[in-house]
Amino acid sequence: MAMTAEVKDELSRLVVNSVSARRAEVASLLRFAGGLHIVSGRVVVEAEVDLGIIARRLRKDIYDLYGYNAVVHMLSASGIRKGTRYVVRVAKDGEALARQTGLLDLRGRPVRGLPAQVVGGSVADAEAAWRGAFLAHGSLTEPGRSSALEVSCPGPEAALALVGAARRLGVSAKAREVRGSDRVVVRDGEAIGALLTRMGAQDTRLTWEERRMRREVRATANRLANFDDANLRRSARAAVAAAARVERALEILGDTVPDHLASAGKLRVEHRQASLEELGRLADPPMTKDAVAGRIRRLLSMADRKAKQDGIPDTESAVTPDLLEDA
């Protein structure tokens, strides 16, 4: 089951005892999943959701809390509709329900954000508002670089109200307009986990966190492997470049090169991939890596000075792009 469906399934089974929180969830779900329609002069309340269990929960809550009967219609997948959808409709008592849930104000005008009693309610009401909004139009992506918990909103006022509810829960959420659609997005991994728990999807949070940890471990391992590979490549190229320069230095100096510098240089040429420490162990008598590095440095410096005096290519000329590519 996809993460979004897992969250919605768990939230739909959550038992909420607080009447105030249940009312806040219903109001939010109706606000984010549907709207008010005028049919034959009457107000009809509708909410369209993507899971049958959500529709059944909403229908039950509307009856338990307000005493109104809601009808559920199933819309089969067709055309642009990818999956089966469920429409919860209250027609006969639509206006009464709209007023009681706060979807209509005292003057009978549609509320553009969230109802005042939800916005000014308790922390449990803020959790319920998020639960209703997620059940209506929420999504949760798999953990990764672009992981996000997101809710599509009916308008900017509803988005800002949801951001405010998140703030009350200690979660940082941002309202954004994406391709003409208002959305509220939470991207931080810790914040997503906290919000899942706040809404009531603790089991899904544990699953999501486990996947996030596994992904982070894999990503760290890959980074370390890439880092090690890059270091090895750099070391190999540096050794090949040094060997080429030493070879050129021995050509430039010929018989004039001091024996102790010549022996260090020959070790570098004969063992191109070896580290300075390994060269020191191969020397007779053995030397420290600093002693090897010092002798090679003096050899190159002496050869470059002579090349400059004689007007010939120095040791750097031996290090060509083709040479490094082959390293």
Swiss-Prot record:
Transmembrane residue ranges: none
Region (Disordered): 304-327
DNA-binding region(s), residue ranges: 275-308
Keyword Cell division on entry: yes
Classification via InterPro entries: Homing_endonucl, Sporu_reg_WhiA_N_dom, Sporulation_regulator_WhiA, Sporulation_regulator_WhiA_C, WhiA_LAGLIDADG_dom
Top-rank taxon, per record: Bacteria
GO molecular function: DNA binding
Pfam families with a match to the protein in the record: HTH_WhiA, LAGLIDADG_WhiA, WhiA_N
UniProt KW keywords: Cell cycle, Cell division, DNA-binding
GO biological process: cell division; regulation of sporulation
Coiled-coil segments on the chain, per record: none
Keyword flag ATP-binding: no
Family in the record: Belongs to the WhiA family.
UniProt xrefs under HAMAP family: HTH_type_WhiA (MF_01420)
PANTHER family given in the database record: CELL DIVISION PROTEIN WHIA-RELATED
Function in brief: Involved in cell division and chromosome segregation.
Protein name (record): Probable cell division protein WhiA
Gene name, Swiss-Prot/TrEMBL: whiA
